[in-house]
Amino acid sequence: VADHKVHDLTPEEVSKGMADGRYLLVDVREPNEVAAEAYSDGVVVPLSSFDPQSIPDPKGKQVVFACRSGKRSVTASLAAQAAGLPYDKHLAGGILGWKAAGLPTKTGG
């Protein structure tokens, strides 16, 4: 078994990568959390029913997992790697860190 690692990215790195078209943000929080407050861009693949195959084709982008605080995103990355996908990045600090960095979120679905 390969020794899977998950690389931490800062909110600033992820925001810039998304703006540059290099990163696809995959939010693994639950639908009720996403409805209350969401990242400004990205796709939602809840960890509770996580299937690495359900992640959309990133079309050349690098997948970055994100959650509330940075724990579930690590779990999702390790699960994706175990399924043979090269998705080894996550947003350290989650949406809490994202907001602390002054980055935009959207509310109300």
Label the predicted regions.
Residues 1-24, 31-62, 71-109:
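Rhodanese-like catalytic fold shared by cysteine-dependent sulfurtransferases
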Residues 66:
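Short, surface-exposed ligand- or partner-binding patches at beta-edge/loop junctions that are enriched
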